[in-house]
Amino acid sequence: MKLHELQPAPGSRKERTRVGRGIGSGKGKTSGRGQKGQNARSGGGVRLGFEGGQTPLFRRLPKRGFTNINRKEYAIVNLDKLNRFEDGTEVTPELLLETGVISKLKSGVKILGKGQIEKKLTVKAHKFSASAKEAIEAAGGKTEVI
């Protein structure tokens, strides 16, 4: 067998149906669109969420809540991600961004307590969870809120 002799498995490739090419094809005349109506027209079809004139679901349900324009979203870093740094390293948001631990700074960095930390690090972040702070200090490191 050579590369130019390769063929797809039988039945794995299907030829596309050419519609509107005579009644003998089985998809002629109306081309599978049925008779008249909105869906038979060019560009026809109903918009997303349209339920045939019945009040759509999104209008039957009540409005709820609002978007807080002052919301702060923190980039989240779990403890186990900090093990990649050497002992005694000062871990800053800039360093986390540089090393690819976080992709965006957002409103700051929050350290969460998932996983174990074995290194003695000085961690500077905008927020710490109680369990993260406890674990870093138990490993001999320091935490600093910036």
UniProtKB/Swiss-Prot annotation:
What Gene3D superfamilies does the database record attribute to this sequence?
Answer: 3.100.10.10
Outline the segment boundaries, as ranges, of region: Disordered: 1-53
Sorted keywords for this record are:
Ribonucleoprotein, Ribosomal protein, RNA-binding, rRNA-binding
This protein's source sits in the domain of life called Bacteria
Q: Which InterPro entries match?
A: Ribosomal_uL15, Ribosomal_uL15/eL18, Ribosomal_uL15/eL18_sf, Ribosomal_uL15_bac-type, Ribosomal_uL15_CS
* Segments of skewed composition (Gly residues): 21-35, 42-52
Query: What are the record's GO terms for cellular component?
Result: cytosolic large ribosomal subunit
Q: Which GO terms describe its biological process?
A: translation
The task this protein performs is described as:
Binds to the 23S rRNA.
For this chain, the family text in UniProt reads: Belongs to the universal ribosomal protein uL15 family.
**Subunit structure, briefly?**
Part of the 50S ribosomal subunit.
Q: Which HAMAP family match?
A: Ribosomal_uL15
Q: This chain belongs to which protein, by name?
A: Large ribosomal subunit protein uL15
What gene name is given for the protein in this entry? rplO
